[in-house]
Amino acid sequence: MKKIFAWVLVAALLLPFAALAQAPNDEMKIPYTVDMSPEDGADSVERLGDHKNSPYFCQLDFYNMESTDTLTILTNFKTQQQTSEWSCGVSSVLMILEWFDKRGDHNEETLGAMRDVGNKPGATSLKQALQMFEGVGGFDTFSTFDVEGEVYETFTLEFVRETLKEGKPIMIGWNDWGGHWQVIIGYDTMGTETEQDDVIIVADSYDTTDHNQDGYGVYPAERFYYNFTFYNFFPEEELNDMVFIVATPKE
């Protein structure tokens, strides 16, 4: 009887620790301070699609990953899942502010209000994304609007690698999800001369499909590059092709 009691006591003591061991590690997450749309957004399904030891997706610790001779990554880049169906651009700006320790009290709501349409639900154009950096203040930006000549001659995969080596994330808008903003935070050449096997690592505010909602995603670099367009989502003057922003704090 004493042995049974002892085992029950041990089990009771260990149960909380077992639960902690199975809980997802969210050290990479920026805390939520607002919910733009409680009924939807990627945050509304937070971790519900996770599958530990998924046979289909590798689950790597991108948050603590460090650069190597082939990989360039922004170690400890934090992520957040967007709290509405339309605020991927707003969330991407938020994550960049966090990276540079410039987030302060800003959240999706305060940043979205800086767009010329305010927080009216709707996709964020390149111009509106820049408006948020301007509204926060203290940032220099280089974007598709600033490129002279053909954008593809400036925004190359080499440009991505070199920008990351400078510690600068790259905000990109392309046709993922039919139109989506993400932030490039890593690039691996895989140690070969060809770019065919290169991969990019992104901070993704709608990371619901890879069985680990940590806010990171991986894409074949060339496949991303040849799909780097919003198509005709925005008016022509707003730009749709190879839309990007490199924002850095002013010195």
What are these regions (language model features)?
Residues L14-L20:
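C-terminal segment of classical bacterial N-terminal signal peptides
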Residues G149-S205:
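Active-site-adjacent substructure of cysteine-protease-like catalytic cores
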Residues M1-I4:
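Positively charged n-region of N-terminal signal peptides that target proteins for export
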Residues D26-M36, Y187-E251:
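Noncatalytic regulatory segments and standalone regulatory/sensor domains
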Residues E85, G89-L97, E108, L126-L130, ...:
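Extracytoplasmic/secreted envelope proteins and their assembly/folding machinery
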